[in-house]
Each structure stands twice: as C-alpha cells, then as structure tokens.
C-alpha cells in the first residue's frame, strides 16, 4: 500500500502548474468527449487521499466513482495482483482457463444474496455486465422486452444508453438505440406528488400497471433496477417498492436483475444494497468496487438461469482478466478483514449527522432539500430555498469551492442538483470530518 500521509496539503492553487502542463497535453491528445471532473493529475493515491503531480494532497470523497472502496493501493490487492503479473497477464479464459476466475465466481456465490445454487460470468465493465444480464434473461425466458426505471443508469454502450434515463451527457446525439427497452416510474420519495410515505405503494402499482397494459408481462424478459439509483441522484426507492416489483417479476416469470454496480461490495453497509429489504434477485450485476481499482465485472445468479445461454454465447477476450481477478480476491480479503460493512455504517452515521446539522443551522441550510443514501453512498439534493426546484448551479458552485480547498466531490442526478459522497471505506474519521468541514465552509460561499 502507498505510504502516502493521510492528511490534506495544498502547496499550489488547484490545479497546480504541473497539472496545467499535463492538461495542455491532454487537450491535444485525448478526445474532447472524455471529460474530467477536476483536472488535477494523480501521482499516487491511497486511504482517503489523492496526491497530485504538484504535491497537493486532496481528500477523496469520490473513490473513482465508487471503485476504490478498499483504497487505491490496498495491500492485499497490490500483493495478489503483483504476484499474478509475475506469473502471466493473459491467456483468455475461453482458451485456457485459470483458477483465479473460478475462485472469484466461488466468492460471488458465497457473498450474493440467497442460498440457492449460483453461477457467474466475468466481464470488464459495468455496462458489459448489464448487457450480458439482458442476454442471459432473454435466453432463459425466450422473451425480448426489458423494463428499466426513471432516473436509472446502466452504462454507455448502445443497449445500456437506451436503458439509461438521463439524456445529457450520456445519450445526446448517439442514437438510435436498441429496441425493446421500456421505462416505468420509480418511487422517488422526495419528489413523489403525494409524499414519500405513499411513494412505495403508489409507484409500484403504477409501474406494474404500465408494464401490464403497455408491454404485457408475458413479453418481458427482465426487470432491471439499481437498489440505490446511482447517477440518477442516489435515490433510495421508497420502502415497499422493490419487494413489490420483485414479487411481480416472480409471479410472471420475469428475471429480476439487481444492478449493484455502484452500490455493491460494502458500499451501503451491506455486501449488497438489495439486502436492505430482503430482496434475493435472480441475477445481480457487479463491477466498480469488486476489484480494488482493476477492471472487472460480473453477472451472478441462479444456476438454471445463468446456464440458459449456449456454450460460447457469453465471454470476451479480456473478460475476467487474471490480474483483475487477483485484485478482486485481494479486495474481498480486505473487505472481510477490515469489516468494511461496519466502516460504511460508521461513515453514514458521521456524514448524515454533520449534514443534518448544516441543514438545520446554516443560514442557507434550506438549500439542502434532502439528505439520503446508505453507508458510504450519501447525497444531498440542492434546491432553491423554500421550494423543491432543483438548483444545479448551487451543486456546481459547491463542488467547485470544495475542489479549490482540496476536497474531491462529485455531482449527479437527473437534474444535476445532487452532491454525492463516495469516500473510500478505509478513510480515517479525522479526514472524513475535515472534508465535511470544507463542505460546511463552502456553503458559506453560496
């Protein structure tokens, strides 16, 4: 693990001169469509700190978008991946297999919800996992329709763009998209017209009615939902919504898929967010936090469903790369040894407490319309004071002020008005509180 000191340090403006030089090179060489939240160039990272090429140390509240949950240089990940690199980097599992792939699939069978027989297939990215979950569901059901939800995000490939709700920046100008994708309402409690207390029952009834009347349940291969909606704004579907949708799927022979790409692997204080309401999905897609920063994803599910695709129908040249598999085994080892579920719950306790204080005590605290999320997947929704009108400008201004003071935060949400917090689960509590201090000071600049 990197021995980077776990303390914030600013020695230049953000970004510094060396980052500015690299940014000029980037503009000349990298496609303009590849964005960056903060143009500081990383030299090393670990724990809750990112150190840039100018020697600035930033507090990390982003984890590379929920990827480096165990830190960006966790000892077990580095040790296992380094050993694998020394042995071999690639054979292609479909040509000559290797134990690491099998062992990752065994760990996934142990960790994912349910005590039924399970199997997995490994890929490279979250979007690949979602695409393959659709392929598997279609092979199993012999149906074609796929149901997704308002505010959902599932990736940037053609099919997953079609499954994603938000247009800009993910979809604009990139169509037409794959057919047989249908979108229905989700129980967004903060914005549900009759109140959060009614959202679960009413939204599930409305979604089921739309599926039944507009698509036909007998035509649906899969229902796919994030148990905590990520890019859509860290929306927790109101209680009762997920169980109702899962039961409807079960009653109608539809494969229920939990997209846990952002919420999985201890991020919400449980191995998987769907466990909160006792959901046992037919298939579960994972990526991001699975491998400590290395590119790996998976589809895991009921053995009889996973086996529906014909031999050779699943896979890919790089899928389940041996170095990434070694990283995943190191990440899971770290999660278990350090009780990162427990650490995520403590992060929630600290963050929600501090955010509630800001909401109630700051002169402009009513700009925080909602505080939500679980574990180390927490967000605030920013609104025009006294209303629920989304305030994307405030979210952007807060993020910019935090960046200038050495705190990396990210925005999200269909309306662009959500500030999200995804600190590494190994972040120290002093560093966590210092980051929240910076956020509180940033509010004073609004």
Region roles according to the model:
Residues 1-446:
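Conserved N-terminal phosphate-binding loop of PLP-dependent enzymes in the Aspartate aminotransferase
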């Amino acid at each position: 693990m990197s021995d980077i000191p776990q303390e914030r340090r600013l020695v230049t403006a953000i970004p510094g001169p060396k980052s500015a030089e690299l940014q000029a090179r980037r503009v000349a060489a990298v496609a303009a469509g590849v964005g960056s939240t903060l143009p500081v160039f990383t030299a090393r990272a670990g724990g809750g700190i990112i150190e840039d090429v100018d020697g600035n140390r930033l507090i990390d509240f982003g984890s590379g978008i929920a990827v480096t949950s165990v830190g960006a240089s966790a000892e077990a990940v580095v040790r296992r991946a380094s050993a694998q690199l020394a042995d071999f980097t690639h054979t292609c599992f479909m040509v000559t297999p290797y134990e690491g792939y099998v062992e990752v699939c065994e760990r996934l069978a142990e960790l994912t919800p349910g005590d039924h027989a399970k199997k997995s297939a490994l890929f490279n990215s979250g979007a690949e996992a979602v695409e393959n979950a659709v392929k598997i569901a279609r092979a199993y059901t012999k149906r074609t329709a796929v149901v997704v939800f308002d505010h959902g995000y599932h990736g940037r490939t053609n099919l997953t763009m079609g499954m994603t709700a938000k247009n800009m920046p993910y979809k604009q100008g990139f169509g037409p998209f794959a057919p047989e994708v249908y979108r229905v309402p989700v129980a967004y409690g903060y914005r549900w017209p009759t109140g959060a207390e009614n959202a679960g029952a009413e939204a599930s009834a409305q979604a089921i009615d739309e599926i039944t009347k507009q698509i036909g349940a007998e035509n649906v291969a899969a229902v796919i939902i994030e148990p905590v909606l990520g890019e859509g704004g860290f929306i927790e579907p109101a209680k009762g919504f997920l169980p109702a949708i899962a039961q409807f799927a079960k009653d109608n022979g539809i494969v229920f898929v939990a997209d846990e790409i952002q919420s999985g692997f201890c991020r919400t204080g449980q191995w998987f967010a769907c466990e909160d309401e006792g959901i046992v999905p037919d298939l579960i897609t994972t990526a991001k936090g699975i491998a400590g920063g290395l590119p790996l994803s998976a589809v895991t599910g009921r053995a009889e469903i996973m086996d529906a695709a014909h031999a050779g129908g699943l896979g890919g040249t790089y899928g389940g790369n041996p170095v990434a598999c070694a990283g995943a085994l190191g990440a899971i080892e770290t999660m278990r040894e350090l009780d990162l579920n427990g650490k995520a719950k403590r992060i929630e306790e600290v963050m929600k407490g501090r955010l509630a204080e800001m909401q109630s005590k700051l002169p402009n605290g009513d700009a925080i319309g909602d505080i939500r999320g679980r574990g180390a997947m927490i967000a605030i929704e920013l609104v025009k004071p006294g209303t629920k009108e989304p305030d994307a400008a405030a979210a952007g201004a807060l993020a910019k002020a935090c960046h200038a003071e050495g705190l990396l935060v990210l925005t999200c949400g269909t309306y662009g008005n959500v500030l999200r917090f995804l600190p590494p689960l190994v972040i120290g509590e002093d560093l966590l509180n210092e980051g929240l201090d910076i956020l509180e000071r940033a509010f004073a600049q609004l």
